[in-house]
């Protein structure tokens, strides 16, 4: 099994997952158990995709799937922001910036493949 913890994209995705866990803890009950759960699950799934892509010979298809997962996460985060899940706009913007940074790294990795 290939090492993945040294990858910048993995570290960024891990930081995002930890950040989401901390933020969702402070959501209202409604948002915590609906959109919050989806955000948490998707952030963990993004980590799994990165590990799978690092270990696979067919990396391109997994990175394309990761692109879709990141888009799904962006939509969920925006929906959560628009419906009042995030405490403030700054919290949402921080998450959005992290996702964009991961997406850029994914595109660079995809170009190399």
PLM regions with names:
Residues 1-113:
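Amphipathic alpha-helical assembly/interaction segments
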């Amino acid at each position: 099994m290939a090492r993945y913890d040294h990858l910048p994209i993995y570290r960024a995705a891990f930081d995002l997952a930890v950040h989401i866990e901390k933020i969702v803890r402070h959501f209202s009950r409604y948002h915590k158990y609906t959109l919050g759960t989806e955000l948490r699950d998707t952030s963990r799934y993004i980590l799994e995709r990165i590990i799978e892509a690092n270990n696979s010979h067919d990396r391109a298809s997994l990175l394309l799937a990761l692109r879709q997962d990141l888009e799904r996460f962006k939509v969920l985060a925006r929906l959560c922001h628009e419906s009042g899940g995030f405490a403030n706009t700054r919290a949402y913007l921080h998450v959005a910036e992290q996702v964009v940074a991961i997406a850029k790294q994914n595109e660079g990795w995809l170009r190399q493949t």
